[in-house]
Amino acid sequence: CLGIGRFPIRTVEQATQMVDKVISYMENKNTGSWKNNLCFMADDGSNTDGFMTEHMEFADQLAGYVESEHPEFLVNKLYYDAYKKDMTAGTYPDVRSGLQKLLKDGLLLFNYTGHGGTTALSDEKVLTQTDINQFTYTHLPVWVTATCDFTRFDDLNTSAGEDVFLNKSSGGIALFTTVRVAYSRPNFPINDNVIRNLFERNNGRRRTLGEVMQATKNTLSSVYKLGFCLIGDPAVKMAYPEFGMKVTTVNGQSVDGNSISFKALEKITVEGEVLDASGQLVTDFTGIVNPTVKDSKVTVTCLKNSNKDDSPNTIFIGNDSVRNGKFSFTFTVPKDISYSNLQGKMNLYAVDTESGNEAQGNFDNFIVGGTSDTAETDTIGPEIRALYLNDTTFVDGGQVNTTPYFVAELWDKSGVNITGSSVGHDMMLVIDESTVLSYNLNSYYELLPGEDGTGIVKFPIPALEPGKHTAEFWVWDILNNSTVRTFTFEVVEGLKPFLFDVIATPGIAREQVTFHLMHNRPESRMRVGIMVYDLAGRQLWKHEESGTSGLFEN
């Protein structure tokens, strides 16, 4: 078997766009801790289709392999059966929104096991072709879809899988995918081999996607492998970091051979190193480290009485500096931990801000439990330094569009609570005192680099009815002191965006120019038209573009 990839293009314009997309991915300009994140999604089953929990069990085996053999990655599990189904709409809204957020935040790999077709994943339409064509996220995952017909490239109609690849700036960089009807049990060994070959190195180097496909098919004799194909450039390698990372000390104590506990309200200082493939310190690595510390695993009982082990509760997400290959960061363990005295997990990512070289690692030689004897006293809740919708000119009672963008800037000397492990201590936005319009913002909070105790939460509010609304924003610190801010606003349907400024760079251009439009519609679907005129009023250029706007930050 040869490592062949396919570009399902029909026009010269598509060919140009896909080549540019591949070049951009290979140049590795989009660095970030998203490269440590993977998602395994599994369909549910029923007595009528004969699968029951089979899709979830297969996905969990794949996730378990990565967690065991490649613990430097963070595995996100979206198993339908662990979520409540909307029986009226026939879908899983929390799975749907969870997948959209994971894709937006960034995934290195998205893997799906279950039913599917040419226009959607699963009968519940958790992901549809319409969704795919509206993708605007810039972190490009590799997709693996163990389903039916998702990428039927030889049909006159363009399939959903093709659109994942053909999205010129979003979607995915490549797909290991099916072109015909497939079956769950024969699909699993194909999916399993793809995952193993993606992450296992060949003589110390990452395999190209073509080599992954070749190695996968050459180890299988099943005729069902003929229905799997690679959509994308076979010369591309999945863009996970090359360097490794290790923790050397916790609170000045060597991690080798010592028992380490993370106790509630204890201040923890972690030190470590960036290492090359031979285990040597990379002395010229200087940049940023992004640690994520997770509480102990919990067992989630699903609706059909099967279980999954997951790590939904976060102790700390932060950032600090790396200098000459060595890093250090400090945080305080929240009061709301599991107290399980079971193993936790620390995930590490770092990037050299000069060279763009990346590193990743993990540390799990610690347990989570107990309470510190030296905890500091703090009875004051977090300070809400700024709170607004869409932009900083917002005033209480102001008018906004139907999908306003909520922003709050926070500070707390001890730290903001985002653990999600205790009822009543989540960061929440509650609109009109409605449970339907109540949003958990824990995962939308991020610490600001170089700002001790300062962070920001940014959340795109789903569509609201026109009229006046009241909202409450609740936030807690890690000692469970709370702060609440109440504000009002009026939703006006059809409210026009306000354009603050248009900046062209460079100011004097001969060949090309980039236009930056500053407006008050962050994270909104927009259609933008730009016309360029000379001093005599003659139109020189005209362009229209549709997409989702970014968030302008001073």
What is the role of each PLM region?
Residues 539-554:
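Glycine-centered tight-turn motifs at strand-turn-strand junctions
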Residues 354-383, 484-495:
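Short beta-strand elements
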Residues 39-40, 256-290, 388, 392-427, ...:
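Contiguous beta-strand segments within globular domains
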Residues 1-319, 323-332, 340-342, 348-350, ...:
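Cysteine-dependent hydrolase recognition
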Residues 490-534, 545-546:
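Glycine-centered coil/turn sites that cap beta-strands in beta-rich domains
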Residues 245, 377-387, 469, 497-498:
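Proline-centered linker/hinge motifs at extracellular inter-domain junctions
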Residues 309-332, 338, 444-460, 550-554:
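Aromatic sugar-binding surface patches on proteins
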Residues 352-357, 475-481:
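Short, solvent-exposed loop/turn segments at the edges of extracellular beta-sandwich modules
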